[in-house]
Curated annotation (Swiss-Prot):
This is Bystin. The gene is bys. Disulfide bonds: none annotated. Belongs to the bystin family. Keywords: Nucleus, Phosphoprotein, Ribosome biogenesis. GO terms for cellular component: cytoplasm; nucleolus; nucleus; preribosome, small subunit precursor. Required for processing of 20S pre-rRNA precursor and biogenesis of 40S ribosomal subunits. The modification Phosphoserine is found at residues 148, 152. It comes from the Eukaryota. Transmembrane segments: none annotated. Its main location: nucleus. GO terms for molecular function: snoRNA binding. The modification Phosphothreonine is found at residue 145.
Length: 436
């Protein structure tokens, strides 16, 4: 092996600073980063950076306009999304902005109220507390019954310590605004008697933020049938009470409705259909609940089934709002649903009452979206209907749409005639692998 090399360490001599400078033995200045001149920079900017620059410039311009010309600044519209979980408590949803699309005046609102049916006692939505008390009374009347029917409420004896714990959860949920939810509350959907435990927490006294968190937890854990019960017994009464008391809806409750759409079948059966079947749905409720449907993506089958039920039930002004919102989604509806919508409009041919503008708007939406999915007989019947039920602004547009329709039976006949002249292909046994 060779000898190890010595480290090349420069010896430092005791010389004064003047000699070090003159001899050039001081450390040289390192090359600093050169600043590029603006002319030397690349002229090409990628699309993403340019979008950020334009957005920042637009935001700055809006801020300057707000400071200098506040009267010229337009009010911004709020875009709702499922991720809007952290919202201030005082933010609310008002139906005034949503009514702009419906183009209604005071006379139209009066016509809407004429078609509002009186609430039937058997159709009213029951609160969870009332239903729990009914079940307790039934159990006391029938001591020998140990197990309730499947799908009904499970009433069991509750340990005093468990009851005391959930009373503490109740106090937390009353004043909850943000933060973590108690773990004892999160396990309620997994319990067999979850309705009875939920009754201890008093859902009607929850804060709006607690209702949103509860809806998020229950819709993710419960099945479709159990989620439907939660929507019907807890969420729907709370939203309607909030609208009735404050004339507007808290943003947390609105987000809870949007979160409930994660279970679309439960949402339709537990909220929309009970709301309309009662016949006492107000215009404010119809607009706000309908906006959730209009702004969310719903599977076609669930939308079709709900639209079919709405077309077949007794009419109220709120039905037309939901029919219009569902038709505006432009889904490929089955012919059975299209036929039900046609019969829904035709049954008013001999009705002597003046129909609200909402009915005419829903008919126009149907003609615009599904004019090519109706038969020739249905088109003629609708044109005949327009002679008896007309609106000076909307009916001409409906008639024009129907007259320009390509009916489905005509298209089927043309398709069959086009295929009639073509020679039919003869398949052999080899083609279907039948030989051997």
């Amino acid at each position: 092996m060779g000898k190890p090399k010595k480290a090349n360490v420069a010896t430092i001599k005791n010389v004064n600073l003047e000699k070090q400078i003159t001899e050039g033995r001081v450390a040289k200045n390192k090359n600093k980063d050169k600043v590029k001149l603006r002319a030397e920079e690349s002229a090409n900017i990628d699309a993403r950076s340019s979008q950020k620059i334009l957005a920042a410039a637009k935001l700055q311009q809006l801020e300057l306009d707000e400071e200098n010309f506040p009267s010229l600044v337009t009010v911004k519209k709020v875009n709702f999304s499922l991720n809007d979980g952290h919202v201030k408590e005082d933010e609310e949803v008002n139906e005034t902005d949503l009514m702009a699309d419906l183009d209604m005046d005071e006379d139209d609102v009066a016509a809407f109220e004429r078609f509002q049916q009186p609430a039937q006692e058997g159709k009213r939505t029951l609160h969870l507390s009332k239903m729990i008390m009914q079940k307790i009374q039934e159990k006391e009347a029938d001591i020998h019954t140990k197990i309730s029917d499947e799908g009904s409420l499970k009433i069991e004896e509750i340990d005093p310590k468990v009851k005391e714990m959930y009373e503490g959860v109740r106090d937390v949920l009353k004043r909850y605004r943000s933060g973590k939810i108690p773990k004892a509350f999160k396990i309620i959907p997994k319990l067999r008697n979850w309705e009875q435990i939920l009754f201890i927490t008093e859902p009607h006294n929850w804060s709006a933020a607690a209702m949103f968190q509860g809806t998020r937890i229950f819709c993710s854990v419960l099945s479709q049938a159990m989620a439907q019960r939660f929507y019907n017994l807890v969420l729907l009464p709370r939203v309607r009470d909030d609208l009735c008391e404050y004339k507007k809806l808290n943003m947390h409750l609105y987000n809870a409705l949007k979160r409930a759409l994660f279970k679309p079948a439960a949402f339709m059966k537990g909220i929309i259909l009970p709301l309309l079947e009662g016949g006492d749905c107000t215009l404010r409720e119809a607009i706000i609940f309908g906006s959730v449907v209009a702004r969310s993506s719903i599977p076609v089958l669930h939308s079709s089934a709900c639209l079919l039920k709405i077309c077949e039930m007794a009419y109220s002004g709120a039905n037309s709002i939901f029919i219009r919102y569902f038709l505006d989604k432009r889904y490929a509806l089955p012919y059975r649903v299209v036929d039900a919508a046609v019969f829904h409009f035709l049954r008013f041919e001999n009705d002597k009452r003046e129909l609200p503008v909402l009915w005419h708007q829903s008919l126009l939406t149907f003609a615009q979206r599904y004019k090519n999915d109706i038969s020739s007989e249905q088109r003629d019947a609708l044109l005949q209907l327009l002679k008896k039920k007309s609106h000076f602004k909307i009916t001409p547009d409906v008639r024009r749409e129907l007259q320009a329709a390509s009916c489905r039976d005509v298209e089927m006949m043309e398709t069959d005639n086009g295929l009639a002249g073509q020679p039919a292909k003869m398949y052999t046994d080899a083609d279907v692998e039948y030989e051997g």
